[in-house]
Amino acid sequence: MSRKCELTGVGVLYGNNVSHSQRKTRRRFEPNLRSIKFRSDITDEVYRLSVNARCIRSVEKAGGFDAYILKANDDILSSAARAIKQKIIHIKAAKSL
């Protein structure tokens, strides 16, 4: 499993630990990933995605999982999230006809 958020694309960053004497040693900054179940109102299904804590707040602020994923850019979504987005778009278009 990669250390990357499936909805925002946030991944591992690299930097330095800096001591009081200014010695620098390399370190990794890993995202705060959580495996969360999101419920889609349009598809009426539950999806389990690995997302960071900030993304959870962003989904709530956007008005739910469906609103967030429809608004999200396809370039940063994982392949699983893109498939979910296409499914939501397809069902939404079928309901509007």
From Swiss-Prot:
Coiled coil: none
Matching InterPro entries: Ribosomal_bL28, Ribosomal_bL28/bL31-like_sf, Ribosomal_bL28_bact-type, Ribosomal_bL28_sf
SUPFAM superfamilies: L28p-like
Any single GO CC term annotated in Swiss-Prot or TrEMBL for this entry: ribonucleoprotein complex
Protein keywords: Ribonucleoprotein, Ribosomal protein
GO biological process terms held by the UniProt record: translation
GO molecular-function term, one example from the UniProt record: structural constituent of ribosome
Signal peptide: none
Record keyword Ribosomal protein present: yes
Pfam family, one: Ribosomal_L28
Presence of keyword Ribosomal protein: yes
Similarity annotation: Belongs to the bacterial ribosomal protein bL28 family.
PANTHER family linked: 39S RIBOSOMAL PROTEIN L28, MITOCHONDRIAL, LARGE RIBOSOMAL SUBUNIT PROTEIN BL28M
Protein name per UniProt: Large ribosomal subunit protein bL28
Gene: rpmB
